[in-house]
Amino acid sequence: MKRTPLFEKHVELGAKMVDFAGWEMPLYYTSIFEEVMAVRKSVGMFDVSHMGEFLVKGPEAVSFIDFLITNDFSSLPDGKAIYSVMCNENGGIIDDLVVYKVSPDEALMVVNAANIEKDFNWIKSHSKNFDVEVSNISDTTALIAFQGPKAQETLQELVEDGLEEIAYYSFRKSIVAGVETLVSRTGYTGEDGFELMLEAKNAPKVWDALMNLLRKIDGRPAGLGARDVCRLEATYLLYGQDMDENTNPFEVGLSWVVKLNKDFVGKEALLKAKEKVERKLVALELSGKRIARKGYEVLKNGERVGEITSGNFSPTLGKSIALALVSKSVKIGDQLGVVFPGGKLVEALVVKKPFYRGSVRREV
């Protein structure tokens, strides 16, 4: 299994390590519950160095990215980032990602760990007609997420630039604990926070400095377990569960990242798909504390209407919550049933998204 540059730090902290997409990653350090609560009330710090980073350079970098992703990259100012998906020719989602516009001839793409090789090969295959150079810098890049309502005031102690000046989905290159770092106001938890991108060799030094800050504010390191709970509470999607190449953006509530007034891979298929959307992703609150798993059937009046894509117990809400891909006829307020192993039917209420709205700054 692969290991991030912070592997030894996780072992020192007594983390429960698990295999995630071929990476040996911390599932939790003390408990998922405590780590979720730290993110919600103070700060949680995540090692997300397993994510993939690609550097795109060249005079046609912006037009190339614009051709790859569904969102509008060309009108983005330097120093801003954008969330998007990449689709195949059939409109299926290859991956969701964040792209940073560094300059008119340089962009940085951050993709999901499980898709690094697939994404890089797909991107390279489309680069031949553009004056660009695409590099996979994943192995030499570390990524640390510092998330929670106290993230700005806490992190500011170590950062030379004023964090208040970094707006949501904006970034700048700065010095953090003496190390050159790209600091972005982005995250996957529903809280305010920052993601720190730096050279892998410098990651342990920065991690240690951040750990010293966390101890002062009752913050804590957080593993993939807490990350998954936080993202589900905030109703952020997970690739491979809530979406994949068999779903299109309109089915999973991502129509807002599809800009049909420009050209991109999969546009023709999405123009057609938009006219006949038969499924949608809905939020469910389940009765009891049992966790609905991916693939569990969802029934309405005894008839199958879809299936669970993600489920977990929410410590923040004290409820079992889930996302389900269901027939478009399902609406908020509907009472559904989720079929658990053994045929047990658990009641589920369709609720408004998101389940939880935290301190995240929504102005982009």
UniProtKB/Swiss-Prot annotation:
Catalysed transformations (reactions): N(6)-[(R)-S(8)-aminomethyldihydrolipoyl]-L-lysyl-[protein] + (6S)-5,6,7,8-tetrahydrofolate = N(6)-[(R)-dihydrolipoyl]-L-lysyl-[protein] + (6R)-5,10-methylene-5,6,7,8-tetrahydrofolate + NH4(+)
One GO process term, biological-process aspect: glycine decarboxylation via glycine cleavage system
GO MF term set: aminomethyltransferase activity; transaminase activity
EC number: 2.1.2.10
Keyword terms of this UniProt record: Aminotransferase, Transferase
GO (cellular component) term, any one: glycine cleavage complex
SUPFAM superfamilies in the record: Aminomethyltransferase beta-barrel domain, Folate-binding domain
Recorded superkingdom: Bacteria
Entries under InterPro entries matching the protein: GCS_T (IPR006223), GCS_T_bac (IPR022903), GCST_C (IPR013977), GCV_T_N (IPR006222), GcvT/YgfZ/DmdA (IPR028896), GcvT/YgfZ_C (IPR029043), TrmE/GcvT_dom1 (IPR027266)
HAMAP family per record: GcvT
Summary of the function given for this chain in its UniProt record: The glycine cleavage system catalyzes the degradation of glycine.
Self-association and partners: The glycine cleavage system is composed of four proteins: P, T, L and H.
PANTHER family for the chain: AMINOMETHYLTRANSFERASE, AMINOMETHYLTRANSFERASE, MITOCHONDRIAL
Assigned protein family: Belongs to the GcvT family.
Official protein name in the record: Aminomethyltransferase
Encoding gene per record: gcvT
